[in-house]
């Protein structure tokens, strides 16, 4: 019975971790004070596009976030994408550590009280 309850709490807490991992609390940055996010595929695609623009001797690019247009220096956007990729990687590591901690926990109260929001890096903030 106790193991059944422990597994139930673990499943619930695991779902909460996964929901938190995909929320704006984790998947966001600010640009000029406005929340935004670029998923992995978009970040990779942007790096490719920016390299092509750079090869064509362009200095600036147009970036659209949440319906707002930003005309930015290509090198600046590439630097921003590096920061975002490192942030996303660190968030991934924190999430995986939380999932591992929950999976390996044997105490019901510790699972119930587990704080899955701790340990995440500070959201990147860019002002351009």
Walk through the language-model features, giving the residues of each:
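A preference for well-ordered globular domain cores
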Residues: 1-128
